Amino acid sequence: IMLYVGSPGILGEYYIWEQTTKQARYIASVHEAVDQLELGSFKSVKYMASDGVKLQGWLLMPRSGKPKGLVNYIHGGPHGPTIPYDYNSRMQIMAEMGYAVFAPNFRGSGGMGSGSFGDNFTRAGFTKWGTRMLDDMREGAEFVQANYEVGERVYTMGGSYGGYSSAQNMVRHNDYYDCSVIIAGFFEFDQLKNKWDGRGRAGTSDYVNTVMGTDPIELTAQSPIHNLDKIKSPIMIIHGKVDLRTPFDGAKRFVAALKKTDVDFEYHWYNHEGHGLYFNKNSSDQFKKVNRFLNSCDSRPPLNPKVASR
């Protein structure tokens, strides 16, 4: 039997289970260089939403120095939680850049049985992708700011649904986030429903309508492309040109619409990349650009210096 073992500090290792000796024999590492690095460890943070719902997230602090700010890192799905039992390159890299990174398990997260993140908790996020779920994210970040030394500025970042929410956060919570990094996101519900690669499969239409909703007024209100006038802070858009899950065409349309506004934004397209960046050179380039972008945001006055004061 071959076993795969991973952790926040180990990218991945392969073992062979020897049935005769009842021992696991090491075979190889996914990336020996990463395994030699001293990486940060995650801390569980429990907080309560403004409506009394108990929530939880994971906080990763820089290994040295005072954090330059707090990155509210939003997981994809969205109906699956962030769990720190495997290596998360984005979160570790952001921490190495000097940022505190918080990954909230907001309403709608699921995938952990019938407990805190079970089916009921998952269903609590249905049709609220751009509303209550975003409020849970902000309230988690505010709790972290109030209880940990994480700096004055707060950024929102994520991929897939995390990309969408990082765009919609700039609409719904434009008084809070200092900038946003949007990776492989979508920007309009109708466009996503009609173009994503899962359309046409048995039961998919019913599922999508159940989790996203069908009210045209609500879907428009929760679509960033229809609310560009509310975006006040800088945003960065990153997308692969052959993304079929959150189609590239949606990102292009969003950028075209942004060009007609005064929003401070930049965008980066990657050839031969799909839903996320997987070629090493592109992934490396992505984080260099993100680092530069956040450094430029760091030079701006924070939106909420009083929120971060302790």
For the regions a language model picked out, list residue spans one by one:
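Non-catalytic accessory segments flanking enzyme active sites
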Residues: 1-63, 83, 89-92, 96
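Short substrate-entry loop that stabilizes the transition state in hydrolases
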Residues: 65-68, 73-117
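Conserved hydrophobic/aromatic pocket- or pore-lining residues that grip, position, or stack substrates
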Residues: 14, 47, 57, 72, ...
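Glycine/Thr-rich phosphate-binding loops of Rossmann-like dinucleotide-binding domains
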Residues: 11-12, 24, 81-82, 112, ...
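Exposed loop/turn and edge beta-strand positions of beta-sandwich/beta-sheet ligand-binding modules
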Residues: 41, 53, 68, 150-152, ...
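Active-site-proximal cap/loop segments of hydrolase catalytic domains
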Residues: 104-310
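Glycine-rich His-Gly loop
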Residues: 6, 73-77, 160, 240
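Extracellular/periplasmic ectodomains of large secreted or surface enzymes and adhesion receptors
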Residues: 19, 32-51, 55, 59, ...
